[in-house]
Regions:
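Long, highly charged, low-complexity intrinsically disordered interaction regions
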Residues: 4-6, 10-111
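Conserved small/polar residues in nucleotide/adenosyl-binding loops
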Residues: 113-118
Length: 118
C-alpha cells in the first residue's frame, strides 16, 4: 500500500501531476483544488489512494489528508465513482464539500456529479 508520494513535480496538467520519487515518476490523478496548490518543478507531497481494477491501476493524489478522507467518503457512497468524487472536490476542495454536507446543499453536490458524467 502506498501512503504518499514525495518529490519534485515534473508534470502538471489539468487532472494530472507526476511526482518524481527517486527517479520513478508517479502519475497521480488530481483535483483542480490540489493542482492549485502545486507548482511545476517544486517539491510536493501527495497523499495517495490506489484504485486497482481489471483494466487499470490509478493513483489519486491529494494535497492533504482531509481532501483524501473526503474522496474516500464520497467513493464509499453507492453510485459515486472516482470521477464524480474528483469533480465534487475540484469545485472548492474539502472545505466546500464539508460545508455543502453540513448545510444540506444537495444542489452543489448533484451539479458536480452531473458534470462528471458528461
Amino acid at each position: 500500500m502506498l501512503y504518499y508520494v514525495s518529490g519534485q513535480v515534473t508534470v502538471l496538467e489539468p487532472g494530472l501531476a507526476v511526482v518524481d520519487c527517486g527517479g520513478v515518476g508517479y502519475g497521480c490523478r488530481i483535483t483542480a483544488y490540489t493542482a492549485g496548490q502545486l507548482k511545476l518543478n517544486q517539491a510536493a507531497r501527495l497523499y495517495v489512494t490506489e484504485s486497482i481494477r481489471e483494466d487499470a491501476f490509478d493513483l489519486y493524489g491529494f494535497i492533504s489528508k482531509e481532501e483524501q478522507r473526503c474522496y474516500e467518503l464520497l467513493t464509499s457512497v453507492n453510485g459515486v465513482g472516482p470521477k464524480a468524487a474528483m469533480a465534487i472536490l475540484s469545485s472548492g476542495g474539502p472545505q466546500n464539500f464539508t460545508l455543502a454536507v453540513m448545510t444540506g446543499n444537495e444542489k452543489m453536490l448533484t451539479a458536480e456529479i452531473g458534470r462528471a458524467h458528461v
